[in-house]
Regions:
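Active-site-adjacent loop/helix surface patches within enzyme catalytic domains
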Residues: 1-120
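Basic/polar, cationic surfaces and motifs that engage anionic cell-wall
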Residues: 77, 92, 96-211
């Protein structure tokens, strides 16, 4: 089934291996839907979750939506070709509504099952584009998703601190300016942390590495 947005193309021989979460950064879902469906805007996403929790399919999942932009993950550019994009209606300055998170959990579970994507494949827009993007932002509840097996979160049983650069590379972060990389990592896992890189950053990053 095709969605209403014309902004999509072929997946260039790839299949979805990632799910990228965004906030719309716009006043409401109606405004976001209009932009994501405007051929002149040249942006789109596969799904838009409205304020009331309605999941709106804008682009079929087997098509390449234009949501990620410049960036990379796990050393590979062209994230659009190998990802599914989910936009959540939120201006970026407030918590996400419970009904939106309920819908997101349900939607993620179905997409992950459909495309055989593990929790490590659910990432933030800010993860793959450090310094360029900040969504879904510091108010997004990643820990809630992790409790349902829908994302990764630091283990309570943390081992020794390991070099942060090495850990972030192994997790998937792009090799960009270290300060931007640290900011992107903290935005997701320590959103209210400030200051220079610390042992706590290193311990958390080490706990996220695949066993």
């Amino acid at each position: 089934m095709d969605g209403p947005s014309p902004n999509h193309g072929d997946r260039r021989g790839q299949r979805p291996r990632l799910i990228v979460l965004h906030y719309t950064g716009m006043a409401d879902a109606a405004s976001a839907r209009a932009r994501l469906s405007d051929p002149l805007a040249e942006v789109s996403a596969h799904w838009l979750i409205h304020e009331n929790g309605f999941a709106d399919m804008l682009v079929a999942e087997d098509r390449r939506a234009w949501h990620a932009g410049d960036g990379s993950w796990q050393g590979q550019p062209d994230v659009n070709s190998r990802s599914i994009g989910i936009e959540i209606a939120n201006p970026g300055d407030r918590p996400f509504a419970a009904r939106q998170m309920d819908t997101l959990e349900n939607l993620l579970g179905r997409i992950m099952s459909r495309w055989q994507i593990g929790p490590e494949g659910v990432i933030a827009h800010s993860d793959m584009a450090p310094g360029r993007k900040v969504d879904p932002g510091p108010r997004f509840d990643w820990e809630r998703l992790a409790r349902q097996g829908l994302a990764i979160w630091p283990s309570d049983r943390r081992g020794p601190a390991l070099p942060l650069h090495e850990c972030l590379t192994r997790i998937g972060y792009p090799d960009v300016d270290p300060a931007k990389r640290l900011a992107a990592f903290r935005l997701r896992f320590r959103p209210w942390a400030h200051g220079p890189e610390s042992d706590e950053d290193r311990r958390i990053a080490a706990s996220l590495l695949p066993v």
